[in-house]
Each structure stands twice: as structure tokens, then as C-alpha cells.
From Swiss-Prot:
This is Elongation factor Ts. GO terms for cellular component: cytoplasm. Pfam families: EF_TS. The keyword Cytoplasm applies. Residues 79-82 are annotated as: Involved in Mg(2+) ion dislocation from EF-Tu. It comes from Borrelia recurrentis (strain A1).
Amino acid sequence: MSISPQEVKKLRDATGAGFGDCKKALSVAGGDFELAKKKLKEMGIVSADKRSGRDAKEGRVFSYVNTERVGLLLIACETDFVAMNSDFVAFGNSLIKQLVESGRDILDEHQELEIKNLAATIKENIYVSKVYISNIASNELVKNYLHGDHSKIGVFVKFKIDDALKMQDEKLNNFAMDLALHVAAFSPLYLSVNDICLNYIKEQEEIFMRQMESSGKPENVVKGIISGKLKKHLGEIALLEQGFVKDDKLTVKEKIEEVSKLILSKIEVVEFKYLSVG
């Protein structure tokens, strides 16, 4: 039977086993997820490598962008020393380039084997923790950024530009890079308040209500305070509502509008991604 890459990835995430081993186990199990997990244990795959049981709390973020796609990759390891290892860094840079150029966010069998070989050479538990690949349209501008020598934080920000002739504008590109730095510094969870799920908003509102239960203030005053607290909190986790890193008198949304007027073209942030070690 045909085994989809998504099924293989799900089993990989659950067991930590390699791509080829997961695919084989799923094939033998006829696609049954739980049976495939059992088959991996029977094959000795899940527990065979003693290093696989050790915590991998360190790591490094890698990024690559071309004209068609941008990607972020987080490879986990056990120590900061290995995260700075030249072989580890070279492997990560090569892997994210391969993934971006192929448009895949799932490793193939050869790439899985390369990770196993690197782990055996370095003698640490090493694995791909997160991969994110995003396509770039012809009217979109992307800026990526890795923070510090250890690259423990990696981000990209994607902009839609109405006038494609403005893509090379210096003011636009400087602002785009500044916003990538902003995302690295403030780690927003959402693009806008509208992207925040209603359940989260309701839960947060209930938290603020419990905090005000013993305040002794009139109900209308309490409602106003809760409304203010909620607005402030949501603004802190939504990128467009955050105070811009280089001028906190303006929100990011207001800064975008300002730059749009400067370059005489509407610009819009359509996507961002933030990855960090730990």
C-alpha cells in the first residue's frame, strides 16, 4: 500500500525513528499507526541508539531564502559546544538549502542517514526538531534573520508589495530588515489580533475577571479595567499591535502605513515565522 509523507512524519514525531524505518514499519503494519509504533519497538529501532534517550535541549536555527521559497530549520543537540561545531553548522546550512530548493519539509531517507552519521561522529543526540518552508510570490519580499553567533533564534518576515517596481527600494528593505529584528526581539505569537482564537481571548478575560473579584470596585469600573487589560495583553502578542522596535510611539501597523506612504506603494505583512532553541 502507499504510505504518505504525512503519515511517516507523524510516526517520526511520535517515536524519533528515522524516515526509512518509519516508512518500513508503516508498510509492514498496513498503515496502522499504533501497530507501526509496536513494529518499531520490535525492530529495536526506538531504543537501539542509547543516545536517543538523552535530552537535546540545545541546538541551532538555520535559514535559507531564494527567489521561490524561504525556510527555517531547528536542529536540536545536547550541548552548546556541538551547536557551534563546524560539521554541525555545515550540515545544517546544507540541509536547509536542500529543503528550500526542493520545497519539502520532510527529510528523505538519505538525509535521515546523514543525521544518524553526524550523531555517531559527534557522539550526541541530534535530530531535526522543526522545519518550516514557505513559498514566495513574485510580488512578495522576504527578510530572514538569525540572532547572534549561536543562532538560537531565527525568523523571517514576508511582505506583499502592491507595486513590484518598489521591491528594491532602500527604505522598504531597511524597514523590512528592521521588522525581522523586531520579531526576533519581541517574539509575537500572532500577526494581528484578528488571528487570535476566541477561546484564548475568553480564557484570558476570565483570568482578569478572577483577578478583580476582590477589588471591591463597582461593576462598570471592573469591566473597564478588564477591557483595558485584555486590549493591552492582546496587543503585546500580536505583531501589528506591538510598539515598533525602533520607535515605540508607533505600532508596527502604523509604521507599515508610514513606510507605504514614503515609497508610494501599499505594503502588507502577510506572514512571519519565529523559531528558537529551547
